[in-house]
Amino acid sequence: MRIILLGAPGAGKGTQAQFIMEQYGIPQISTGDMLRAAVKAGTPLGLEAKKVMDAGQLVSDDLIIGLVKERIAQEDCVKGFLLDGFPRTIPQADAMAENGIEIDHVIEIDVPDEEIVKRMSGRRVHSGSGRVYHVVFNPPKVEGKDDVTGEDLSIRPDDEESTVRKRLGIYHEQTKPLVDYYGKVAAEGRTQYNKFDGTQSVTKVSEQLASVLK
């Protein structure tokens, strides 16, 4: 079972990825992890990627595709794999198809931007312990203070509203077009495309996923 998971940052992809991995015994392949592993293992592609990254440049699509092919040929991918954070763009999706990497399911977790902003910009963290709160969903007993120590809570830079909106803008510009792309591929019968409402409970989304993936 070869799966691509699409959805904006904060849509809840990580939680559902975990569910899919445990349920179907397939590994999650994230390009970041894959790059680090290839560099560490010193494979020819890994060494090439290291050279590019050390020079402060972006790793090319061709190189990433090579790494994906190398990774999915490994033993733990026999039953399939879950691609996370790749492809991000239509040229990458085209390159995958040209390289014969077939996908059985494309899953989109859809959450409106305003809901994502509410989810992410409402997070508060106690830096000393890593305890996480949410002003709406899981508020501290005293506003702005950690329940245990009474110390101040802070907002992670990644959770600042301006940062969240910027990341959402990049997602809509680069990755959202993949939804239409895979919609067409599905219409041609070359994959299955399903969209899930990510504002539902985690359990509900997991149940719906399971009914599609069985």
UniProtKB/Swiss-Prot annotation:
This is Adenylate kinase. The gene is adk. It is found in: Cytoplasm. Monomer. GO terms for cellular component: cytoplasm. Keywords: ATP-binding, Cytoplasm, Kinase, Nucleotide biosynthesis, Nucleotide-binding, Transferase. It comes from the Bacteria. One of its GO terms (biological process) is AMP salvage. Catalyzes the reversible transfer of the terminal phosphate group between ATP and AMP. Plays an important role in cellular energy homeostasis and in adenine nucleotide metabolism. Belongs to the adenylate kinase family. It comes from Shewanella frigidimarina (strain NCIMB 400). The keyword rRNA-binding does not apply.
